[in-house]
């Protein structure tokens, strides 16, 4: 089922009515608000929607509106007879899925907008966290719609606490509470206390007289008197100046919300300097306002001309995973609670010389998760680039200490791969070869040697390892494989002819660089498997394995001029050069495994994790290192310490969110949450599941690999990469993928796809919680665009 956009129209003011508890008067409030709208000629027609109702039909809330607000359109989507919570009442019926409920609500509101309705209320059942039919909290069930809230507070004893708790639960989930109403009670005076509380939040609170009490007798005369009393009550409250003023306020807020979204792009163009963006020729129309985000989707503002009756927000699949950060979905309430808990417990506290529980627990959990016996220490930084700066400092210090080099007198280089990218801070920029990213950076120097390498792709339905033409004399020709699992059978391939060729080429190259050119190298730095920003370059895992093996197995290459080679102290000591893995992008389940190093059978001496570390919520980075690397900075001298840090180092909010994110992802791995995806990639006569798999279907890859415009495709974990043919050459400056990006952005009537391109490569990336149904829908759009 296609996702729904959040609910926003120019002409229709739609609000959701939540209660601080059950039996606080939600339907009473809905009735007099609709009656007041009907009475005021400038408010348009009113409508009332009850998505889920429980209890006898003659007591249903929509029936109450039909009786006491006869000029209001009413509708109930799902009625269950038993007067209990919806998740219990629905058990004896065919339970509608949450997405079906959302679609029905959105479709009903859209129909009403087209019919000229000006005011609509969507009333929930029970309290804020009362379960829906599938057992999920209503606050989460309806969150994709993000309707502005009218909160009915509780005027009874204990109502102050329940009302504030209800408000905070809504706020935590990203709802906007536009107004609060409750019944006056001169004894408990909750309206006085809550009025002051919500005034401090700039939220109007309207106290109204309590409705007449229901008669205890249920004879016809008593019921008739009750109905008459209610009619008089509604007639009185409807005319209240406070109620009329509230309706005017709701009109204004809807108008202001639409106007703000209207202006956001043009205002941003005037004030925002965007990263990785050439602003020359950039217009306001090129900027997409995002009103909110939930799960895999942005809610983007439609800037194209639309009538007042058409919805203004559209669901947009976050195809770049918001620069590769998304793991557990946007607006994740669990992570929001984690952040709020840590913010409430700590705020931010100084880290050096101190320790707090989230930082310690995360460090221990991360070391256990990556399961690399070399790694024993965790250094915290703010983002991937700074984490790699720290890794570089660690590696170079260890190498210089072992080999007796003075980096102030001679240049110490790194070994890496062409197309690598490790961040935008100046040190790690020098760890990449000259490119579009750095050629206009004034302090860039480029200190290293970067190996070209064979690429993995599927073309014409066949997995291939494609060797650059300039290397075929040394590495041999292209190879074909029966499956992606076969490509990753590194332990077998390392003994093959290709493995021997790779090692010989790497060894001879390093010998030439050191002996003939006199270069010194202090670290081997690699992005395991996929070089992301360089163009989603899928490196042959065998080549990376051989590179690490040659560096570690030939320490004599790097100690030229030293009489004796300091031998590693243990089997876990680094040898040759410290091996640094930049897993900022590829680590922590992005490629379907806890660590992308496991694909290579290589345990790095230093590893950096960032993007998925916090599930996609806040910045945080860890640089993991061995004790031997750590000891290179240990001495009586302060100057020998790792003098690097940030004001918000190991901030408690990020550490707590990361701890809970890591726990969630580990649980998903253990409980088989991805088994359906794995089974899709299982080969005939293979084991239970594929060793290498993707959330993107194998059939999609096979289909796209035959497309006329496609040079090659691959998918692994949550990453899908499509390389398009370009007669003028591939690379970051290519525009070949722009056309496909434009077609995806156009999407369909219900949703579209946001994506990023890297030259001739368009990639899509899901979260680790993406549903198979959602991704197969996206795949359908891709097929339409390319086949």
UniProtKB/Swiss-Prot annotation:
Cellular component, GO, one term: mitochondrial matrix
Annotated family: In the N-terminal section; belongs to the dethiobiotin synthetase family. In the C-terminal section; belongs to the class-III pyridoxal-phosphate-dependent aminotransferase family. BioA subfamily.
SUPFAM superfamilies: P-loop containing nucleoside triphosphate hydrolases, PLP-dependent transferases
Compartments it resides in: Mitochondrion matrix
Induction note: Expression is increased when transferring biotin auxotrophic mutant mycelia from biotin-supplemented medium to biotin-deficient medium.
Main location: mitochondrion
Function, as annotated: Bifunctional enzyme; part of the cluster involved in the biosynthesis of biotin (also known as vitamin B8 or vitamin H), a water-soluble vitamin that functions as a prosthetic group of many carboxylases, such as acetyl-CoA carboxylase and pyruvate carboxylase. Catalyzes a mechanistically unusual reaction, the ATP-dependent insertion of CO2 between the N7 and N8 nitrogen atoms of 7,8-diaminopelargonic acid (DAPA) to form an ureido ring.
Amino-acid positions noted as binding ATP in the UniProt annotation, renumbered to this chain: 23-28, 123-126, 184-185
Amino-acid positions noted as binding pyridoxal 5'-phosphate in the UniProt annotation, renumbered to this chain: 384-385, 582, 646-647
Catalytic activity: (7R,8S)-7,8-diammoniononanoate + CO2 + ATP = (4R,5S)-dethiobiotin + ADP + phosphate + 3 H(+); (8S)-8-amino-7-oxononanoate + S-adenosyl-L-methionine = S-adenosyl-4-methylsulfanyl-2-oxobutanoate + (7R,8S)-7,8-diammoniononanoate
Keyword DNA-binding: no
Pathway info: Cofactor biosynthesis; biotin biosynthesis; biotin from 7,8-diaminononanoate: step 1/2; Cofactor biosynthesis; biotin biosynthesis; 7,8-diaminononanoate from 8-amino-7-oxononanoate (SAM route): step 1/1
Binding site for Mg(2+): 27, 61, 123
GO BP: any one term: biotin biosynthetic process
PANTHER family, per the entry: ADENOSYLMETHIONINE-8-AMINO-7-OXONONANOATE AMINOTRANSFERASE
Protein name: Bifunctional dethiobiotin synthetase/adenosylmethionine-8-amino-7-oxononanoate aminotransferase
């Amino acid at each position: 089922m296609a996702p729904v956009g959040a609910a926003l129209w120019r002409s229709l003011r739609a609000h959701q009515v939540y209660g601080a508890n059950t039996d606080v008067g939600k339907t009473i409030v809905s009735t007099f608000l609709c009656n007041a709208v009907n009475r005021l000629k400038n408010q348009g027609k009113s409508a009332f929607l009850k998505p889920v109702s429980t209890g006898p039909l003659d007591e249903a809330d929509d029936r109450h509106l039909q009786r006491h607000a006869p000029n209001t359109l009413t509708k109930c989507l799902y009625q269950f007879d038993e007067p209990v919570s919806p998740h219990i009442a629905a058990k004896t019926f065919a339970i509608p899925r949450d997405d079906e409920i959302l679609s029905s609500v959105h479709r009903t509101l859209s129909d009403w907008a087209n019919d000229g309705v000006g005011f609509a209320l969507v009333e929930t059942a029970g309290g804020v966290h009362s379960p829906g039919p599938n057992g999920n909290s209503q606050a989460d069930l309806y969150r994709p719609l993000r309707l502005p809230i009218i909160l009915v507070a509780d005027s009874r004893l204990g109502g102050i606490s329940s009302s504030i708790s209800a408000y905070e639960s809504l706020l935590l989930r990203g709802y906007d509470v536009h107004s609060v109403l409750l019944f006056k009670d001169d004894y408990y005076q909750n309206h006085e206390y809550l009025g002051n509380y919500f005034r401090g939040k700039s939220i109007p609170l309207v106290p109204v007289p309590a409705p007449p009490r229901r008669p205890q007798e249920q004879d016809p005369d008593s019921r008739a008197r009750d109905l008459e009393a209610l009619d008089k009550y509604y007639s009185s409250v409807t005319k209240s100046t406070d109620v009329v003023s509230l309706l005017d306020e709701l009109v204004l807020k809807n108008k202001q919300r639409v106007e703000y979204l209207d202006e956001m792009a043009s205002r941003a163009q005037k004030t925002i300097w965007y990263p990785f963006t050439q602003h020359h020729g950039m217009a306001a129309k090129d900027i997409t306002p995002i009103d909110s985000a939930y799960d895999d989707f942005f809610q983007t503002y439609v800037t194209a001309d639309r009538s007042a009756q058409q919805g203004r927000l559209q669901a947009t699949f976050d195809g770049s995973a918001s620069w590769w950060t998304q793991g557990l979905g946007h607006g994740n309430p669990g992570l929001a609670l984690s952040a709020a808990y840590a913010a409430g417990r700590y705020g931010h506290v100084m880290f050096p010389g101190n320790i707090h529980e989230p930082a310690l627990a995360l460090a221990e959990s991360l070391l256990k998760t990556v399961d690399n016996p070399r790694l024993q220490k965790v250094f915290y930084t703010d983002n991937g680039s700074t984490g790699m700066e720290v890794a570089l400092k660690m590696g170079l210090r260890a190498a210089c200490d072992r080999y007796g080099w003075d980096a102030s007198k001679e240049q110490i280089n790194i070994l890496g791969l062409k197309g690598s990218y490790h961040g935008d801070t100046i040190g790690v920029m020098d760890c990449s070869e000259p490119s579009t990213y750095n050629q206009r950076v004034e302090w860039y120097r480029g200190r290293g040697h970067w190996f070209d390498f064979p690429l993995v792709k599927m073309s014409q339905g066949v997995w291939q390892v494609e060797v650059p033409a300039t290397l075929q004399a040394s590495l041999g020709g292209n190879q074909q494989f029966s499956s992606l699992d076969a490509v990753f059978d590194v332990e077998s391939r390392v003994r093959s002819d290709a493995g021997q060729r790779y090692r010989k080429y790497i060894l001879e190259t390093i010998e030439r660089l050191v002996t003939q050119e006199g270069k010194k190298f202090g670290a081997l730095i690699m992005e395991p498997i996929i070089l992301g920003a360089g163009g989603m370059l899928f490196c042959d895992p065998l080549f990376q394995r051989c590179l690490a093996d040659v560096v570690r197995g030939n320490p004599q290459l790097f100690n030229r001029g030293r009489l004796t080679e300091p031998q590693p102290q243990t089997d876990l000591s680094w040898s040759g050069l410290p091996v640094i893995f930049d897993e900022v992008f590829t680590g922590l389940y992005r490629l379907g495994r806890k660590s992308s190093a496991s694909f290579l059978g290589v345990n790095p001496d230093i590893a950096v994790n960032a993007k998925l570390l916090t599930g996609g919520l806040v910045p945080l980075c860890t640089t993991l290192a061995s004790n031997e690397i750590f000891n290179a900075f240990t001495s009586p001298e302060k100057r020998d310490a790792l003098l690097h840090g940030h004001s918000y180092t190991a901030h408690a909010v990020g550490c707590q969110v990361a701890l809970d994110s890591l726990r969630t992802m580990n649980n998903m791995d253990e409980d088989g949450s991805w088994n359906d995806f794995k089974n899709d990639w299982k080969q005939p006569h293979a084991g239970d599941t594929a060793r290498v798999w993707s959330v993107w279907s194998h059939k999609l890859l096979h289909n796209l690999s035959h497309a006329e415009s496609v040079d090659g495709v691959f998918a692994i974990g949550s990453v899908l990469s499509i390389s398009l043919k370009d007669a003028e050459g591939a690379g970051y400056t290519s525009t070949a993928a722009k056309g496909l990006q434009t077609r995806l952005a156009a999407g369909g009537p219900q949703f579209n796809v946001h994506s990023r391109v890297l030259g001739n490569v368009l990639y899509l990336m899901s979260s680790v919680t993406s549903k198979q149904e959602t991704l197969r829908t996206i795949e359908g759009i891709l097929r339409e665009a390319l086949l």
